[in-house]
Amino acid sequence: MKIITQILPLLIIGFTIILILLSIAWQRNHFMHASLTVVGLLLAIFSLFFVVHGSIANFTTLIHVDSFSIFYTGLVLIASLATSTLSYTWLSNNKDYKPDEFYILLLISTMGGILLTCAHHLTALFLGIELMSLPLLGMVGYTYRKKKVLEACIKYTIISSVASSFLLFGIALVYAVTGQLSFIGISNYALNEINYPLMLLAGLGMMIVGISFKLSLVPFHLWTPDIYQGAPTPVSTYLATVSKIAIFASLMRLFFYAPFNTHYEVKLLLCIIAICSMFIGNLMALSQNNLFRILGYSSTAHFGYLLVSWLVIQNVLVLETVGLYLFGYLLANLGVFGVISIMSNVSKKDTDLIGYYRGLFWYQPMLSVVMTVMMLSLAGIPMTLGFIGKFYIITLGINNNLKLLTILLLISTMISMLYYLRIVVSLYLYPAEKLHTNTYIQYNWALTSRGIMVLISSLLVLLLGLYPQPLINIVQWAQIINPR
């Protein structure tokens, strides 16, 4: 019974998928299936409270449930809930496509994300990535009659296949050397070996390449802005949050067990990727006028910052730092994509250009304030949650003598402020003449489910930025428990 309790979120999501499948066979009803999805995700979130009171459990050798996996499962479920909230209106506006199957794809992908957060074995890691990525192909290309959507789907299919190939070949090489696939078995080998064989280094390198594709790290990031721009807004939201947070959490556990970061070649590779991601991501974003492309390059920079944590992952402050940063990143992205979704709905077209938001404050002051808060949080401005996360990363770098990397991180952050503040300034400029007749002026967005989600996100970003102690307590609790 205790073991069943530990995997309760997975069971609830699985039951919801079966229920929606049977319901579709009986009758198609978009509202009912959207409601079932939301209810299933809410129940899965509430079930985490029962999981918290249970003991640490190994359901199989593949899955390990502890406070760390519970925390990141919560992040995955919250992001999936936000995605389903944004999806309802988008699917309702695209009446040429049957909407019901989208929710099945979303829930299956969410199961893959949950599996990743609990992964304790390279097999579970690979299965989780594939279970999350394959439904995403259908989600990206759901409105396939649109040229840019079809283009994004084809690109994502190719990139996902290449990334999986690198990852799988890397796993095979690691297994060939260590004879182990479990994180603990690999950890035992890594702790007992001083000089790693060339084949093991090659395997680790290929795994890092595969993961870098998934996390949009330089030089494997070029697909990101194209996919963000081409995919529907709710799917871009999911790509920016769930698909990256779940993979990063799983790799955090692997590197926490097996100290590969102490090896010179691995550390050098991670340093190069981190520095290139921070600078190239931010520099490329400077020249963009499309919000989706800016957010795509921005995500590359943010995960470049987070790579600093992998270099010193055995430090006691690392898990707390990453938890704070990713929670702030999640809320800010949900808020920004939520605002874009609200604007797109009323105009019945994509509002992804910065110029479209010029003077928004003069017609929708609350919406512009929400957008401002999210941009300031992404930039790491004080009094927002994003500042707390960035402060922790800088502290982590200084405390571990990564002074050069920390200085480069600060310079990169200052570069990022240029494009974040450019968006903020445009919100308060006097609007162009064509915006005087725009339909969104009278649109009461705050009473919609998306509006409520956006308001809650912005409120949390501000409150936790001013008083982060409740979140700090949670991330201090969400530690990896070594079962050895």
Swiss-Prot record:
Disulfide bonds: none annotated. One of its GO terms (molecular function) is NADH dehydrogenase (ubiquinone) activity. It comes from the Bacteria. GO terms for biological process: ATP synthesis coupled electron transport. It is found in: Cell membrane. Belongs to the complex I subunit 2 family. NDH-1 is composed of 14 different subunits. Subunits NuoA, H, J, K, L, M, N constitute the membrane sector of the complex. NDH-1 shuttles electrons from NADH, via FMN and iron-sulfur (Fe-S) centers, to quinones in the respiratory chain. The immediate electron acceptor for the enzyme in this species is believed to be ubiquinone. Couples the redox reaction to proton translocation (for every two electrons transferred, four hydrogen ions are translocated across the cytoplasmic membrane), and thus conserves the redox energy in a proton gradient. This is NADH-quinone oxidoreductase subunit N. It comes from Baumannia cicadellinicola subsp. Homalodisca coagulata.
